[in-house]
Amino acid sequence: MKPENKSPVLDLISAGMKTVVNTLQPDLPPWPATGTIAEQRQYYTLERRFWNAGAPEMATRAYMVPTKYGQVETRLFCPQPDSPATLFYLHGGGFILGNLDTHDRIMRLLASYSQCTVIGIDYTLSPEARFPQAIEEIVAACCYFHQQAEDYQINMSRIGFAGDSAGAMLALASALWLRDKQIDCGKIAGVLLWYGLYGLRDSVTRRLLGGVWDGLTQQDLQMYEEAYLSNDADRESPYYCLFNNDLTREVPPCFIAGAEFDPLLDDSRLLYQTLAAHQQPCEFKLYPGTLHAFLHYSRMMKTADEALRDGAQFFTAQL
């Protein structure tokens, strides 16, 4: 689409979202647009420090988990000793950015609001890791903690997956992987999905929205995909294009959150409509006035905190 025809998003977002967009960090260098991926990852981690401040304190433990690809770091957030379930969190970042530090506040709030143990999995980023390595690492971590639940003093009888953006795709893909391959890691009580991508190649929102403000132009989305996938055939894999999977049966209850001015919004809408059409348990909520990635900004933005509370409430209602 000709750029001039796109929606004037920055004029339409909420007052709270505008405050976030206009918040400056004076000691932060400019985004290294032409830098290496290592430099961009470093910048992303530095930029998120401000937004992660002031998160709830709780018992936190770090463990390295063995997988066939090597060791993967995990971080456990334990809000109480008698957790009713364990929720695995997969961070967003277009498959190429992000880590356990960039999403620390999100995981802490989710643990606090749900009173469940939250385990963040620092899956290997792309392009170093290609599909389906991240999913296989997530599944391996889930199996590891299921087998070692008593040693780690966690409740793995009921589990869930949660994620934002690319992490939302990984969350649902991992749940479907466990179902399809009949791997028992505990009952999957729910899946929490904030503004994910689930396999659409094109859509109204992908045409109308997306720009330099969110890093989600059509060119950006293509770049993330090319970094993540091994080959063209992977685009049709039921664990990348999740609409090619069987969404008519045994899908865990899904909380699907959409951001109003997110180019990926139609992915969330289609996922909800598909699940609902086949009587699969699901809930969709649209957060007005928001951009993609708004979940990070709960320090300043009430809507972000609300979205985390909504997800936590949905999950605990399934227990």
From Swiss-Prot:
GO terms, molecular function: carboxylic ester hydrolase activity
Top-level taxon in the UniProt lineage: Bacteria
Keywords (A to Z) from UniProt: Cytoplasm, Hydrolase, Serine esterase
Localization annotation: Cytoplasm
Listed SUPFAM superfamilies: alpha/beta-Hydrolases (SSF53474)
Pfam families on file: Abhydrolase_3
Main EC class the enzyme belongs to: hydrolase
Quaternary context: Homodimer. Interacts with MalT and MelA.
Function statement: Displays esterase activity towards short chain fatty esters (acyl chain length of up to 8 carbons). Able to hydrolyze triacetylglycerol (triacetin) and tributyrylglycerol (tributyrin), but not trioleylglycerol (triolein) or cholesterol oleate. Negatively regulates MalT activity by antagonizing maltotriose binding. Inhibits MelA galactosidase activity.
Listed NCBIfam families: PRK10162.1
Name listed for the protein in its UniProt record: Acetyl esterase
Provenance organism: Escherichia coli O9:H4 (strain HS)
Lineage, uppermost ranks: Bacteria, Pseudomonadati, Pseudomonadota, Gammaproteobacteria, Enterobacterales
Gene behind this protein: aes
